[in-house]
Amino acid sequence: MKRGKKYRAAVARYDRAERFSLDRAVGLLKEVRYASFDETVEVHVSLRLKKNQTVRDTVVLPHRFRAEVRVLVFCKEDRVSEALAAGAAYAGGAEYLEKVKGGWFDFDVVVASPDMMKDVGRLGMVLGRRGLMPNPRTGTVSADLGAAVCELKKGRVEFRADKTGVVHLAVGKTTMDSAQIVENVDVFLSEMDRKKPVDVKAGFVRSISLSSSMGPGIWVVHKSEE
């Protein structure tokens, strides 16, 4: 893939083979950025996983950077007010099931009470391919609707390893304070370490890199190597 002049100039400002401390990597990412818009900062973590293993969970990042999250809650009528009071944009049962079935997607994340999952499951093909299907493992199927919605509104995000064993997660914006980006990355990495498969003894993390939307990747030293 041919890269533009600005990208090549950014790459020339540091040794791409070198691995930096997290603090320095974030600072360097800001130094070499060249885009005219507020880019998203992403962390990419390559994991040592067996073919039958995966990593999937959620984490609440301490510093929010996304636009307000629109939460749709599937629940019985007697729990609608509870969900809305917690901050859900929409809450209900049959009405919203039909709207989604008809192609309505004016929301960012879906929460469901356990007693609604039989009905929500019928939307598996519709919600699943968009990554919106509620799942107990990610806290989006919950009897405590208020807590589930509040966590999402506070900035809880899902992370999962792809087929190659790499986890990609947005952790900030380039205009954020560097310390906030560093803390978001630290919290995410700590949470991911806690979720590693039990039979992985050492070397769980192969490599870590940071990048902005348009910028080059910057290798980061994992804390176990510091």
From Swiss-Prot:
GO molecular function terms attached to this record: rRNA binding; structural constituent of ribosome; tRNA binding
Q: What are the entry keywords?
A: Repressor, Ribonucleoprotein, Ribosomal protein, RNA-binding, rRNA-binding, Translation regulation, tRNA-binding
**SUPFAM superfamilies tied to this protein:** Ribosomal protein L1 (SSF56808)
Against InterPro entries, the record matches this protein to: Ribosom_uL1_bac-type, Ribosomal_uL1, Ribosomal_uL1-like, Ribosomal_uL1/biogenesis, Ribosomal_uL1_3-a/b-sand, Ribosomal_uL1_CS
Single GO biological process annotation from the record: regulation of translation
A Gene Ontology term for the protein's cellular component: large ribosomal subunit
Which domain of life, per UniProt?
Bacteria
Q: Does the record carry Glycoprotein as a key word?
A: no
* Pfam (any one): Ribosomal_L1
* Keyword Chaperone tagged: no
Q: Which family does it belong to?
A: Belongs to the universal ribosomal protein uL1 family.
Summarize subunit and interaction data from the UniProt record for this chain: Part of the 50S ribosomal subunit.
This molecule's function is given as: Binds directly to 23S rRNA. The L1 stalk is quite mobile in the ribosome, and is involved in E site tRNA release.
| PANTHER family xrefs | 54S RIBOSOMAL PROTEIN L1, MITOCHONDRIAL, LARGE RIBOSOMAL SUBUNIT PROTEIN UL1M
NCBIfam families for this protein? rplA_bact
- The protein's name in its UniProt record: Large ribosomal subunit protein uL1
Q: Which organism is it from?
A: Treponema pallidum (strain Nichols)
> What are the leading ranks of the lineage?
Bacteria, Pseudomonadati, Spirochaetota, Spirochaetia, Spirochaetales
Name the encoding gene, please. Answer: rplA
